Amino acid sequence: MKPVISVIMLTAVLLGATSPCFGAVAIEGVAFEKTSRVGTNDLHLRGVGLLRYMYFIKAYVGALYMRPQDDAGQALAMTPRRLELQYFHAISAADFAEATTQKVKDNVSPETMASIQDRLKTFNALYRDVQPGDRYALTYLPGSGTELLLNGQSLGRIPGDDFAAAVFAIWLGPAPIDEDFRDTLLGVR
């Protein structure tokens, strides 16, 4: 009996070591690493979630990375963070730009919107059309700005702490794209 248990244990270890999700967290078949390096900061996975459109259409899955010492209330503060979103459907760059502008407006004051308007236009011009399986990453590093990446390739960086707070508010702010998704990313649900 002992050799059978040993073989089963060894098989489980070997399968786990070759699994694409080893050292990662998976949701809806999409793996996210448990840590992400931003500048000199090791960010830890805070939460992962699935965003549904009209309750039954899977739009995308996301993962939020923050420093371990930062709590959910600091999600929009001047602290390093990274949000990764992997899409299940094709979405045009124009649709991203339109949705980004609207959700930023929903989350910031008219004064803030006026002060970031030019940077928001520049940011929206960075968007590219995505296909199923593509992954955007939004990374903020204080003093360096907010960087948008598509499938690991940098598309550009926009300066300003105010800009970072406004853009991350789309998912993490008081009027997010979806409250359940926000709370899951923040690890409070």
Show where each model-derived region lies.
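Bacterial N-terminal signal peptides
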Residues: 7-17
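Positively charged n-region of N-terminal signal peptides that target proteins for export
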Residues: 1-4
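Terminal leader/tail segments of proteins
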Residues: 22-189
